[in-house]
Amino acid sequence: MKWSAIPFQTLYRSIESGEFDFDLFKEVLPDLQNLNLNTDKLKNNASRSQLEKGEIELSDGSTFKVNQEFIFEAISLSDELNLDEIVACELILSGDTTANNGKVQYFLRRQYILQIVSFIVNCFHEDTELYQELIKNGALVSNILSAFKFIHTQLSEIKQQINKAQILENYNALFQQNIKFRRDFLLREYDILSQILYGLVDKGAIMKNKDFILSLLHHVSELDSNDFFIIYYTPAFFHLFASLRVLPDADVKLLHSQFMKDLKDDSIYTKPVKVALIFIFFAYFIGWCKEDPKRRADTMDFKTDVDEPMTSAVELGAIEQILIFAADTSIVEQDKSMELFYDIRSLLERHIPRLIPKQLLDDEKIFSQTTNSTYNPASATDNMSGRGLWNPSYPGMMSTTGTARLNSMPNNVNEYSYTTIVLSDQTQEFFLSSFDDVLQTIITDCAFLLTKIKDAEEDSLLSGEDLTLDDISLKADLERFFLSIYFFYASRPEYSCTFWSDKESNAYGFIEWCSRCNDNLMRSCFYLMVSSLSFGPENALNVYHYFGENSSISWKNIAQCLSDYTKKISNFNSSLHKRQQFSESTHNDIDSTAVALEEGLNEEAVIFLSSLLTLVGSVTYQVDEDVKSSLSKVFSDVLFEFTKINTPLVGAAFKVISNLVPKLESSRTKFWSFLDSLIFKDSSLNYSSESYRNAFTNVLTKYSDVLGFLQLFHNLISIHSRENNSEYMVFGKLAFPTRLGQGYRKVGIWPYFDYIFNDILAHVDQIVDIRNKRAVQLPILKIIYTGLCSFDYSVILNSIPAAANLDALVDCENFFNYVQECPAIPIFNYIFTEKIYKSIFNVVDVGVDQLSIELEGGKNQAELLQLAVKIINKVLDYQETYVEELFPIVKKHGKTDYFLPKNYSLHGLRSFYDAIFFNIPLVAHLGLYVGVDDQILATNSLRILAKLSERSNGSVASLSKRNKLLTIFDSVDESARIKDAFITQLESSITDAGVLALKLELLDFLTSNLSNYSRTMTISHLLLGFQVSNVISLGPNLATFISSGTSLLDSLISVLEASLNSITKDNIDYAPMRLATAALEIILKLCRNPLTSGLLYSYLIKENFFERIMILDPQVTRFTTWNGSPFDNSTEEKCKNFIESESVGAFLSFLAYRNYWTQYLGLFIHKISFSGTKSEVLTYVNYLISNTMYSVRLFSFLDPLNYGNICEPKETLSIFTNVPLNLEQVTLNKYCSGNIYDFHKMENLMRLIKRVRAESLHSNSFSLTVSKEQFLKDADVECIKAKSHFTNIISRNKALELNLSVLHSWVQLVQIIVTDGKLEPSTRSNFILEVFGTIIPKISDYIEFNITFSEELVSLAVFLFDIYNRDRKLITDKGTVDGRLYQLFKTCIQGINSPLSSVALRSDFYILANHYLSRVLSDQVGSEKVLQDLRLGSKKLVEIIWNDVVYGEGTSRVTGILLLDSLIQLANRSKENFILDSLMKTTRLLLIIRSLKNTDALLNSTTEHINIDDLLYELTAFKATVFFLIRVAETRGGASALIENNLFRIIAELSFLKVDPDLGLDLMFDEVYVQNSKFLKVNVTLDNPLLVDKDANGVSLFELIVPIFQLISAVLVSMGSSNKAVVQTVKGLLNTYKRLVIGIFKRDLLREKEDKKNSSDPNNQSLNEMVKLIVMLCTLTGYQNND
């Protein structure tokens, strides 16, 4: 046998995926046929001794040596499960390393086996090979009974272990949790075995095996008659007997004969289940006989073979057992509110015990005592004693029926799970369909028997005997059958519709027949039965019409009947009161029961009234509003009156009235007036809250009264008037009349909440029985939630932008009054009190270990928990609005005629967060609930945690580095389990949209608690698996820590991989793409943050994260579809469809993913360049840039940029044009379907604007031509249009932003590869050329429409070209230029010429073009090609460059002049320098020369403070300009042009050349802080340069004067010394700067004396240069000092 769960899990998954693995099925077939059995592998000495030797051999032949710890774990598991020790070892080895996981593997294996077998048996046709393989050799059929028995054995062993633990005082929480775990699995197994058994019957696998049928019946008969597990066999038996035609005739007759004998057995009465099954066999036997009358019916004697045995079975309790089957599986019996009505079931169940899950209980005796169904006639006797049935002090019938029974449960029974067992959906379906067929068969084929029973009962009543209700109920089998129908069909409209679908049917005829019953008990049961057939709108309408059209039993008759009884009881109370007064004077006791009987008020009357109320309540529950209104007119007044008299059915009457409450709030006035009058009209009230609460307790005297009242109150304050997609009441509306109670009490709704909170909820924990407690808690929590939703909080925030007058929008006198009336305010007030919020917290504090599984009826508990967490979440959402806005309004402006408790305040709570943080177990439970399957519970728990985290991060009080939530989660005992809960939720299968939304919220929670830069540890670090002690680490090798390999971080990586796996290049769906993006964002944040980056990178490298994700990295082409739709913006309609669907979500998510992944790669390579070896770095880099196999992977990252922009919106808005909508507030929709944005907040604002303007339509500002209705319609249309419009804007902006981010990240990645990638110069230069080949076409395109994108790529090109130049110098550079660079140069020229280019972009183009020209000048062929292309467009080019040089600010001035320099050099190679010609044709050259004066002006601005950066920039520009002019001066024509453009005149005007070399220049710098001064005065001379910083060369005067003298020399040399005019001008210049010339020569003489001529000091070298220039000029011009 295979003991690992893995092969069965694999087979199960193959079934789920729709691709059944037949080979694996054949391999595990023996295990499947063996079901859950391991009876041949129980613990034994041989295996134990082998294990204790330390070496074991597994079933597959492999051997292991094991240590003592492992041996101990294996023995422990073996003892607990009574399992072979070697098998225990195999289970542990197949799972994780603990016995607990071995146990999980054991039960999971069994679970998978049974699920697979059930699927094959029930879903495959009996002729299929798969099914035939499974049942061949009969092993499966022969094992199924043993499988059931094996579970009995294991449950029995569990009980023994419990007894042992209790004796040893080891029965702790952990032990109990372990027991519950095993019982849960065994219960599921039993349920699935039931399905398998049914399937085998259905497929006929056991139909020819009468011995098996009899042994199965014997097995069921031997079970205790109160064992709920009997129910699991009933679907198979019912279906078996319904399929008698499939059995051989001889077998049917043999069964018939056997059952006849069994009924005559004296001991048969002890086996009621067997009697009931035999009865059902006979019911079907009649039909079987009818199918072939000649061979079957004619050979039988109907009386002896059918009638008498069936009658005998009825007398032995067959119908009572059927009633128990129906009642203990009914939905209605699980509804505690049904106990408001008379518990007629206890009356009619006289002989047979109810079913209890006895095999799942620790102590069934306690449970049996508390659920004993035997009717106790003493209760009736008690009622007949002194107090009497209708005595005002009588506490109510409930004390003798179900509720009292439950209230009397001992405390410890509440600790039990399994108080209610619910069948799984599949088993339930089999059970319901087969049981329905049983009941319909009895109605159809056993009419003779029902008539016989009815006649016998009526004869008994007519016999004249004085029969008590107790006597009647003993033989009331027809009533039992009616009740069976009631319990079975109630709340199952899909089955009960059979009775109404055809008026000619036997089912409808049965109802007609029943309606003619005259006996009171029969009539009562008839009304109950019909009430069960009214569930569902259609059935309710049928019942409504049935009584409406029935002359003998009409609705009016029923109402009259209720009214008559009301008068009788009222008269009885008066009569009793008078007699009591008389008796006091005569000293005689009054027998109130005798008085009641005189008035005809006995227990039957209670039953009858209860059945009428049940009928009315059931019909009114689901009918439409028109029918409800009609019934309300008939019954409301009658029922109102009924509640005024003290009866045990007041609560029931309240429940029925609650069903009559109309949906429309304005129609509820009558109900409110009645209820308010009932409670307060006759009460003595004063100013105290206690007097108001006493008014309630005087009216609501019993548990049932309170329960009924709560249901009525909940329906009365329920919200119907709400806007679309909103759960809040329309602002300004109330669910009750304004100034409720005016005239006889303090007005308002507050007294109701005061009573509910202080008298009920605050004391609810005193109710012992858990089901009773929940029955009260549930309506109260619903009331609280409804109350919180009764105020639209968004209106206060939106009132200013909407220009709303709140007084005009409310139904009250003004807004302040509305606030005082609204239910939300009292609810907030009471929730802020400790006893109330603790009561709500107690609901949540049940803990994940006490959650009931679905099979044990966990629905009510789940609903309670859901409500409790939703309430907490809602309170946290709006508590600030209450504290800051609503509370002060009531406090300051509250009117005195309204009810307001004296202690109205915030009750010491600054914030509701404080209440939660003080309850540490609550916070821990919320963490654990994140992992449960219940989406509502998990989602709301997570949202509360998100708020708590945000609060504790941002609170002023929290100055410590650890926030409160992190501290709590890290310190509680459940810390590891909380982390495991998050892991479980993230790893759960995505079965619907809700699960997906929850995963995304969980990932958002983690992301929001992570920072890119902060070194503070957060809750996300803990949850992800870091150890967050003083120093963060990957933690120990324990589960949930990263080091162990089973952490939330690992789950995150798995989600990322799984999501990418489901994406192809053909189609990218929104959901997986969004999941992948969210997961990667978290990993990226951890890698960015210095706190975690080092730890995480080492872990990710070990896990081969780079390789795993790169393999799955999604690629896109122009044919890729996005969530099924192509990116097509060719038409407005296609673009609209794309944007308003999930497609745009898929597209944007992909862009975000691509951005994150590119960023990650850049960070990763940069990080590993420091820590890894050269070969390791190159491995990763080559993966990205290698092109040996296919195109470079790196370049595919830019593929998304090939898509065009999303087209701009063309909708025009009118109503919402000037609305101040903040598009940044619009978030992503939590669900991945439809429009991807959540416009909830925006819709609220637009809705308010629409309402305000509609109300103002007739004011001056609005046209009277539009009606209010028309305006509202137009506004609704425009609201839809607005959402479409904003969807487009947001999507377009987001796409542009993300595209730019992708590009920016890619640019950074390329830069990192080039600088940190450890590439050889030749490889790197080739890679750079490939990059140029990719980006140049893109630059060319982007220049025309997207400058921002161009700037990114051009800045990259500048960066790369610089490195390329350096690399080429290291490689033997032959002076040729790679042809691929020419396209770059052309693109630069195109960019410079583009009117869209920014100054910064042009500056980069100048640099690139200059780099290229610098290289091409040494290449003759290249130079000529460039010259040819430039000649054509040189005029415009020169104009643009010149413009930047002369008028530009920033780098373009310098880069432009450098490019002009290179262009001049290039043009010098042609006959005519067309560049220079272009400059000379206008004043361009003159203006360039004049720009030298800018520097002069800056240096002479002694009154202004100079910025150091400005100085350095200006000096750079000055030198660049001078060197450009020198370049121009290199030719005679150029020098001549300079002279013509006043070069020498401008030089003569430069003040800094006239400076005294000894005194120097005085400069004033700001932005330099010295002592108390904000500026600094500095003197710069020839000897003392200005040092800007310690690493830079100083700024010397030589920086300025050397270039100028070089320029003068260049002009003079080019013009020649024969040009007298030039020589004379230069002579004049030397004379002008005579002081400077003398100063330089002086310094030269001093140097010679000090022998510093050859010093390497930069200043010294500049002096040498200057001396040479002056000497040369003096020589060429013949200048003498005396000149």
From Swiss-Prot:
Enumerate the subcellular locations listed in this protein's record, separating them with semicolons. Nucleus, Nuclear pore complex
Give the UniProt entry's GO cellular component terms.
nuclear envelope; nuclear pore; nuclear pore inner ring; nucleus
Ubl conjugation recorded as keyword: no
Q: What is the superkingdom listed in this entry's lineage?
A: Eukaryota
Keyword Cell division among record annotations: no
The protein's GO terms of the molecular function aspect are: structural constituent of nuclear pore
Q: Which UniProt keywords apply?
A: Coiled coil, mRNA transport, Nuclear pore complex, Nucleus, Protein transport, Translocation, Transport
State the protein's purpose: Functions as a component of the nuclear pore complex (NPC). NPC components, collectively referred to as nucleoporins (NUPs), can play the role of both NPC structural components and of docking or interaction partners for transiently associated nuclear transport factors. NUP192 is located to the NPC core at the nuclear membrane and is essential for de novo assembly of NPCs.
Q: What else is known?
A: Present with 2520 molecules/cell in log phase SD medium.
Q: What is this protein called?
A: Nucleoporin NUP192
Organism of origin is: Saccharomyces cerevisiae (strain ATCC 204508 / S288c)
Gene name as annotated: NUP192
